[in-house]
UniProtKB/Swiss-Prot annotation:
Binding site for ATP: G120, S121, N122, G123, K124, T125, T126
Pathways per UniProt: Cell wall biogenesis; peptidoglycan biosynthesis
Key words, A-Z: ATP-binding, Cell cycle, Cell division, Cell shape, Cell wall biogenesis/degradation, Cytoplasm, Ligase, Nucleotide-binding, Peptidoglycan synthesis
UniProt record similarity statement: Belongs to the MurCDEF family.
Source organism (scientific name): Lactobacillus johnsonii (strain CNCM I-12250 / La1 / NCC 533)
UniProt keyword Ligase present: yes
Record-given protein name: UDP-N-acetylmuramoylalanine--D-glutamate ligase
Localization per record: Cytoplasm
CC per GO annotation: cytoplasm
Length: 460
């Protein structure tokens, strides 16, 4: 870890505990900062808050003390990425011209290990896991390691102390995190895709969302590389305007891109066959595109075809992202709880050749589901719907001509009904197409409950 002086003796307010708040607090203490931690939740019985208190952090919880800004001067506010900028503490800090940053800004600037960054509306976690797997296989030959960190669930601050110049950080960046960075310079940055109707409750407009994503490349220069989706022409134009890095592209079908999906192989434009598609374990065209991004990043960082082929042929999928759960009575069951928007369901549903019994539903964000009608018509034989959006999704299912439409209240009710509708040889797919917050705290919690309910089928 680099011993930088940026935060030494600085008075820093951390807003929001969480995983990243806890980790960045410990990191900042080692960098010599004076810390105050504030969380609207009551932390009086929180073990992590107690640990920070013993280390000298002032902990204020249960409310937001906006008046604290009148009592003392802060040099930085480090914001939990999920906290909106309309939060009164953030608004006050911005009014006073106090820099509002997020954990990656601090952690990446003290990292001895080189790093690459990946963002996107869908597919970024799988891409990060694939890249980490390829690069770990490559770096281990010389005693190094690749670490998957960031939005994937492992705070960067947790890893930077042990990561050395022989290692690599593969960083998943959300749009929330990217809004709070001003000076990160990844050797390779990649945007897997950008879709509308994603996090607009946070970013307000699609243009704001795109601008947040583009911050991943804003500090890159001609010595760096930027990986862009050749098929999203409207976004590509904005990316090319923004970046100063050298650009490589990937495409589902366009052979003028640097990397593309061929008939039998994942290929590069110099006619090089990198990986046989049939050897890739994770299903779906979208996952083949994720593989292309991971290949592009890894090749730039020194991996060869043998590293790629080993990693991609042994990777069985990220949890909650078209995750294979089990085969039960000749039904293959998949958990795609990360499908928190229509676009994610759009790529999940066509991933299988077998007839599908689909479970969907969740938080109502005011979207219509008519774009799913053609996919329902082609791939879905029966559908079980729950949550706030169940009737909206039922309308789309009726338009698709699906005869078996079952409406229930909860996911727990949905699982056995889906099994009853299925036959040997079918796929039971949980791809909600909606956020989880009507009934669950996170998509991870929702996915864990789905897997639990599926396993309970075997005991009945």
């Amino acid at each position: 870890m680099k011993k930088i002086k940026t935060y030494e003796n600085k008075n820093i307010l951390i807003l929001g505990l969480g995983k990243s708040g806890f980790s960045v607090a410990k990191l900042l203490l080692k960098l010599g900062a004076k810390l105050t931690l504030n969380d609207k939740k009551d932390l009086s019985n929180d073990d992590r808050a107690a640990e920070l208190g013993k280390l000298g952090v002032r902990v204020i919880s249960g409310y937001h003390p906006v008046e604290i800004f009148d009592e003392e001067k802060f040099d930085y506010l480090v914001k939990n990425p999920g906290i909106p900028y309309e939060n009164p503490m953030v608004e006050k800090a911005e009014k006073l011209d106090i820099p509002v940053i997020t954990e990656p800004e601090i952690a990446l600037n003290v990292s001895e290990a080189p790093y690459v960054c990946v963002t996107g509306s869908n597919g970024k976690t799988t891409t990060v896991m694939l890249t980490q797997r390829i690069m770990d296989h490559n770096l281990s030959k010389n005693g190094g390691h690749a670490y998957a960190v960031g939005n994937i669930g492992v705070p960067i601050s947790e890893v930077v102390e042990k990561a050395t110049s022989k290692d690599l950080l593969v960083v998943e960046m959300s749009s929330f995190q990217l809004l709070g960075v001003t000076d990160i310079k990844p050797k390779v940055a990649a945007i897997v895709d950008i879709y509308n109707n994603v996090h607009l409750d946070y970013h307000k407009t699609f243009d704001n969302y795109v601008e947040a994503k583009l911050r991943i490349t804003q500090s890159q220069d001609q010595d760096d590389y930027f990986i862009a989706n050749f098929d999203q022409k409207n976004i590509l134009e904005k990316e090319l305007d923004k970046t100063k890095a050298k650009v490589q592209t990937f495409s589902e079908t366009d052979k003028t891109a640097d990397y593309f999906i061929g008939d039998e192989y994942l290929e590069s434009k110099d006619d090089h066959h990198i990986m046989k598609i049939s050897d890739i374990k994770i299903p779906g065209i979208h996952n083949q595109q994720n593989c292309l991004v991971a290949i592009a990043i890894s090749k730039l960082m020194g991996a060869d075809d043998s590293d790629i082929q080993y990693a991609l042929s042994t990777f069985t999928g990220a949890t909650h992202r078209l995750q294979y759960v089990m085969t039960y009575n000749d039904r293959k069951i998949y958990n795609d709880s990360k499908s928190t928007n229509i676009e994610a369901a759009t790529v999940a549903i066509p991933s299988f050749k077998e007839p599908e019994v689909l479970i969907a539903g969740g938080l109502d964000r005011g979207f219509m589901f008519d774009s799913l009608v053609p996919l329902f018509k082609k791939h879905v034989k029966s559908i079980v719907l729950y949550g706030e959006t169940k009737y909206l999704l039922a309308d789309a299912a009726r338009k698709a001509g699906i005869k078996d439409i079952v409406i229930v209240n909860t996911l727990q009710e949905a699982v056995p009904r889906a099994y009853e509708l299925s036959e040997a040889g079918d796929v039971i797919l949980f791809s909600p197409a909606c956020a989880s917050w009507d009934q669950f705290n996170t998509f991870e919690e929702r996915g864990d409950f789905f897997v639990k309910f599926i396993k309970e089928l075997k005991t009945k």
